[in-house]
Amino acid sequence: MKFEMHTKIISNEKEVRLHIEDNLFQLILDGYHLFTIQEILSLYKSNEERIGSAIVQKLEWENGKTTLNYQLVSLQSVN
């Protein structure tokens, strides 16, 4: 099973919103991934498109998958 370390979060639009008011999201990734916890990380929609910043709140490894819960702390928007 592969193991990867990351300094940014790339959602590929597969995130699920857990809590609206707290801007909490969950992302499930194949394989085992390691992220810094409770540090601000850049958040990307794809490899090229940065959409904001997030803080990892919880990280779980189970059955060859990584579950990442993060809080969106800033959003880059042109609206």
Task: Give a label for each model feature.
Residues 5-24:
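Short, basic/aromatic beta-hairpin or loop at an interaction surface
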Residues 24-31:
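Short alpha-helix capping/helix-loop boundary micro-motifs
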Residues 34-37:
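Short, well-ordered loop/turn sites that connect or cap secondary structure elements
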Residues 49-60:
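Short beta-strand-centered aromatic/proline hotspots
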Residues 62-73:
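Short, solvent-exposed secondary-structure boundary/capping segments
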